[in-house]
């Protein structure tokens, strides 16, 4: 049997394993079941690809990512790995050829969608094939409360019953303790070895800003910091996705929309362009992103509040997979909380489910309003610890100021009470600031004792007060109606003057108030070779019909730039260059280097 180290070096072109990879691989090769939690970019795929090559038979990978299977298989072909996939995109003839290759033992890895795997015909095929292992990718899809839930994942315990001697590995990039237990219970992994890597992504800078003028805030961020960068902008609704993408195009950016309401062909084309072209901004709902391997995504921006810390961590984790500096920007306001609570109130599910959804939203609000290190709070949620503040989030780079808001809070709560707990924040703020608009006059709210008592604070300052009161649980939102603010038991000590309140003072954030660490720059004297290597990669990628990063990551090109290999043996010493890639297109890159070296 070929050793894991030999496969790592000769097939994948790397000299050493990272983190827990080697331990995971050894357990799986030995026939043990394994559960792996590893952050995005941590190298999860090697944890099943190498054992599939080391063990006799075919490694079967169950994945919900139908749209990405072709790229995943193409990437393996470039490495010289015999791989195939089965899903609904194949013609009957193509599917038959792949099934025949499986039966004949001609596949090292087979990617299959869960709904395809669970068909009797497919299970019968696997009965008659030699299966090396089952890899259940994106295992958090088994969690019924998660936005990535796939009903077919609940039936994957059949693998344990029908193939008891075949080892299984379940993998995910994000799972709190509750989701972890759900994965174990539903997939029958009670005896699995668990490998939980740290959740920290130190290269991602986390920033959360009050939403004032979101389009202008996003535009300033893009123009000042992300010129020519690839990134993802998340929006809550399909309509907002399309409007934002069109607006960005009008501002000179190359932006594409992605949501479940678009045709399958347009989604596939936009995804293909995002993966293959430079400087594309994908504007999307949460329907986009799972399994996206593009390493050079420099930013993820949220124009609406995610429903949970799990969703936020997973979506922001799509930035900076190459380890280079990246930014996660979230713009959030009180209207986000109202909208999400209304959506949750109207969602399917019993009261327990809805209560758990509200608790997850409350945890997300806590992350938004925290005045200490955001990364420490984020990691603590997943049971991970960071001893010192990170120095790479907005709270660390621009420490939050607080102010004694006790009197302002009492004014706010009193005005909610005086207006009958029937209105949203905008109307209550108008009353506090003494507006004489038609709505106030119609309801006689200009006659209230709280009318015009809050002129000393601006509209934005009052919005900050109400946002923080809702986030900290001093006010409730009537989710079933029009977002009216409601008093609760927690606010009574404040109204009675028994409790003082400190609130965060929102900062008018500019792009320079948080320090952006730029990706490693190329020295001026190296720029000619750098651009020539990138041009060579793009040309080879187009010839092979794959995204450029499938040929070589930027880190590999950067090492070529530093080491200047001139022979095949020297090229093999470059991290990311294995035997197959050297044979297929190593000469083209060597020729580029030689031309510049001897020029």
PLM-predicted stretches and their roles:
Residues 1-7, 356-358, 387-599:
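Accessory DNA-binding and partner-docking regions appended to nucleic-acid-acting proteins
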Residues 28, 222, 274, 368, ...:
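Short helix-to-turn junction characteristic of helix-turn-helix DNA-binding domains
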Residues 164, 227, 371, 421, ...:
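Flexible coil/turn residues that form the inter-helical turn or adjacent wing/linker of helix-turn-helix
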Residues 352-382:
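Short, charged low-complexity linear segments at domain edges
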